A protein has these predicted regions:
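Terminal RNA-binding accessory module
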Residues: 1-72, 87, 95, 276, ...
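Extended interfacial segments that mediate partner engagement and assembly in macromolecular machines
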Residues: 54-69, 73-178
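Short, solvent-exposed loop/turn elements at beta->coil junctions and helix N-caps
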Residues: 112-119, 180-184, 230-231, 389-393
Length: 409
C-alpha cells in the first residue's frame, strides 16, 4: 500500500507540506493542512521529496470546492490555493511570513492576522501566453511548457474578462510574432492591451486588431501597446492616456494605496525630515511624504514611471532616475527611509548603503517573505524589527505582502 502522508502546513509557493516515514518533508500541490493523502509520482531528493496528489484519504475541514473550472479541469497554475477556505488561506500566508522571518531572518515575531480585500474579481490585469497551436491562456501547474486555452479568470475584474472574450474572438487578427498579451483595466477607466513581441506590429496589423476588438468589446476600443524584449514600449494608437506598457501598478491599486499609507504612518512625523523613497514608482508615496512636510529624495529606474512622477512638481522633492544600486551613493544622509523593492528584494549593495547611512527608521514594503527575511538578517546588526503587518492582495494565490518597520538599535 502506498504510504499516506498527513499535510501539516502550506509552504511558500502554495504546496502542502507533510512528513514521510523516513523523516523527509514532502511537498504536494493542491493539498490542505489536515489532509491525509497518498502521493503519486514521488521524486526523492536528499532532504525532501516532491509528489502529486494521488488519493485523498481524508479531506481537511479547510478544503472548499474551487470556484474556477480551470483550476481543476485544466490544472491552472495561476492560482495555487483556491481549494482552501478564505480563513485557511489567510492563516497559511500568516505562517509563511512568520516562518520566513524566523528561519531566514532569525527574527522571533508573532505575525498578526493577515488583512485582506476582495476574494474574487480583483485583478486589474492578467497576462496570457500565445501558444504555437493557437492557444491563448495560462500555464498548467508544474508544467511551465504546457498551455491551456483560458476562457475566463475568476480573480480578474469584469472588464479584464470582457477584454479576454474580445481578444479570443479577435485572435486571428493578433499580429504575428506576439508571444504574450496583457489585458488591463486602468485606474482611470482606460482598458488596455499590451502585445509582447520582438518587433512592433505594422500599422495594418494594429488597425486590423483594433477593428476586431471594436466588434467584440462593449466599451471604448482598448488602448493598444507594444512591449519589446528589452523593455521598449510603443503606443499603437493615438491619444492614449493610460499607464502604458511598462508602467507597474498594483493589481489592486486602492489596496496598494492603503498599504503605502500604512508604511508611511510607521515613520511617524516626517515634517522637516529627509526621507528616501526607494523604488518610488509613479511617485504616489513621494507625494504623500511631501504633503506631510518631508524633504524627499526618490529613486526610480523605469523611465516611464519616472516621467509620470515628474508631471507633479514638488519643491521639496529631488528625483533620481536609475537603479537604487547605482544612485544610492548620490543621496544625502536620511532621517528615515521607505523601500518597496521587487520580489528580488534589496540586494547586498542596498542593505550595505542603508547600514552606512544609518536612518532612524526603515519602512520596508515587501512582496516576497524570503527576500524580506534575508534583507532583515543583513540589516540585523544595526536594525531591529518593531512592527510587522501582513496583507493578502492576491487571494487564491500563495503570494503575501507585508510591511515591516525596522528601527535603529
Amino acid at each position: 500500500m502506498t504510504e499516506a502522508v498527513r499535510i501539516t502546513d502550506i509552504a511558500t509557493g502554495g504546496d502542502g507540506v507533510g512528513r514521510m516515514a523516513d523523516g523527509r518533508a514532502i511537498f504536494i500541490p493542491r493539498t490542505a493542512p489536515g489532509d491525509l493523502v497518498e502521493p503519486t509520482g514521488v521524486r526523492l531528493h536528499s532532504s525532501f521529496a516532491k509528489g502529486g496528489l494521488g488519493l485523498l484519504r481524508e479531506a481537511s475541514a479547510a478544503r472548499v470546492a474551487p470556484r474556477c473550472n480551470h483550476y481543476e479541469a485544466d490544472a491552472c497554475g495561476g492560482c495555487q490555493i483556491q481549494h482552501l477556505s478564505a480563513p485557511a488561506q489567510r492563516e497559511a500566508k500568516r505562517r509563511i511570513l512568520e516562518q520566513a522571518l524566523m528561519r531566514i531572518g532569525d527574527v522571533q515575531v508573532d505575525v498578526p492576522a493577515v488583512e485582506s480585500g476582495p476574494e474574487w474579481g480583483y485583478r486589474n490585469r492578467i497576462t496570457l501566453t500565445l501558444g504555437p497551436n493557437g492557444a491563448l491562456g495560462f500555464h498548467k501547474v508544474g508544467q511551465p511548457d504546457v498551455l491551456f486555452d483560458a476562457r475566463h479568470c475568476e480573480i480578474a475584474r469584469p472588464v479584464v474578462n470582457q477584454l479576454l472574450a474580445a481578444v479570443r474572438l479577435a485572435r486571428t487578427t493578433i499580429p504575428s510574432g506576439t508571444t504574450r498579451i496583457t489585458l488591463r483595466d486602468g485606474r482611470r477607466g482606460h482598458a488596455g492591451i499590451v502585445l509582447w513581441a520582438d518587433q512592433p506590429p505594422s500599422g495594418t496589423e494594429s488597425d486590423a486588431l483594433r477593428a476586431a476588438l471594436r466588434d467584440g468589446f462593449p466599451g471604448d476600443v482598448p488602448e493598444l501597446w507594444w512591449r519589446g524584449p528589452r523593455g521598449e514600449s510603443k503606443a499603437l494608437s493615438a491619444n492614449q492616456e493610460g499607464i502604458g506598457a511598462v508602467g507597474f501598478e498594483q493589481v489592486q491599486p486602492d489596496f496598494g494605496d492603503r498599504i503605502r499609507s500604512i508604511a508611511l504612518d510607521m515613520l511617524e512625523s516626517v515634517a522637516d525630515r529627509l526621507v528616501w523613497d526607494l523604488y518610488a514608482g509613479r511617485g504616489e508615496g513621494t507625494a504623500l511624504l511631501a504633503a506631510r512636510g518631508a524633504r524627499v529624495e526618490s529613486v526610480e529606474r523605469e523611465p516611464e514611471l519616472f516621467a509620470l512622477a515628474q508631471r507633479e512638481t514638488l519643491p521639496t522633492v529631488r528625483r533620481f532616475l536609475g537603479s537604487v544600486e547605482e544612485v544610492v551613493g548620490q543621496l544625502s544622509p536620511p532621517d528615515s527611509v521607505v523601500v518597496n523593492p521587487p520580489r528580488t528584494g534589496l540586494g547586498a549593495t542596498v542593505t550595505e548603503a542603508l547600514g552606512s547611512a544609518g536612518p532612524e527608521r526603515i519602512a520596508y514594503v515587501s512582496c516576497d517573505p524570503a527576500t524580506l527575511a534575508r534583507d532583515i538578517r543583513r540589516l540585523g546588526p544595526q536594525y531591529g524589527v518593531e512592527t510587522v503587518r501582513a496583507f493578502d492582495l492576491f487571494p487564491q494565490t500563495a503570494h503575501v505582502e507585508s510591511v515591516v518597520l525596522l528601527a535603529r538599535r
